């Protein structure tokens, strides 16, 4: 055990531990919040583990919510904040390689910590600021390594998503994989196929947006994890570019666009790929637009109206994508051209469909064609953005 200075987020939660202890129970801060305290990383909330059973937690606090009571978790509302409190437990029988078939509540913190994924996440801290470290998590923090608790293969058979969490933590923390843990991922990477795509995607995106994604991507590819991901099997050579980026992506849509370009997805294959990863329709659409913009800009054939249709957000994203791929596209020139456009949105056009109808144009395909012609004329600088000038330009 060692001592650590307790910061504000823990100080605010301290009365919760005190109240549990006053009721005769043990209570500790556990997991990632303790790890991040020691690494001096931002902490947004804390997790609390206790010897109290869920019903005893509910009896101890006036306000609570049964957020995961079957697995021992109760959310209590106290002092204007909410806290997840979980009973010490053991788990067994992971037939789906993700969730335990059986959860057993125990009265011993040691047993609870044994079920956790990595040594750096198996740390606990009591109300006095003492760190309880059964697996040399403190040493692994100093060595900056991701190491499984106990036998790595057992941990990954319990929850195969932990393999993706390992490489995600590499990226976020700038840590390396402990060799036995790495070998266990190589031996068991096929188990990732048992995990829902949504959960894999969440870890994949966090990996990509982490501060040290290059090394994490090296192990993502080398351990075989990429082979179990939608659309990435057999693509190690193309994806190896991810291991050489000077800086990783800082935007999720740009990241997916980068993947689409690296694996040479034709335009009509982007949507199926994005759907296979269970991405939202909005993300799907944005990625298709970014890749299309990147392809157009790469050819150097873009008109002012093309820039107008691309729009500022997708233009900036396409330029980021070009930078990641080592294909600088005169970014400032293109942005300056965009900023000089007379209008940036169709709603800024001096006329609309109702105005054309008042001018005698019947609702018809012709009306849409005239609006398009007016928009192109204004954007390209052929005509001033005024009703009179547009009327003359359209000869109506």
Curated annotation (Swiss-Prot):
GO biological process, any: tRNA 3'-terminal CCA addition
Single GO molecular function: ATP binding
InterPro entries, A to Z: Bact_CCA-adding_enz_type3_sf, CCA-adding_enz_C, CCA-adding_enz_firmicutes, NT_sf, PolA_pol_head_dom, PolyA_RNA-bd
Binding sites annotated in the UniProt record for ATP: 32, 35, 116, 159, 162, 165, 168
Class of enzymatic activity (EC top level): transferase
Coiled coil regions, renumbered to chain: none
Known cofactor(s): Mg(2+)
Record carries keyword Disulfide bond: no
Residues at which CTP binds: 32, 35, 116, 159, 162, 165, 168
Something else known: A single active site specifically recognizes both ATP and CTP and is responsible for their addition.
Subunit structure: Homodimer.
Name of this chain's protein: CCA-adding enzyme
Originating species: Lactobacillus delbrueckii subsp. bulgaricus (strain ATCC BAA-365 / Lb-18)
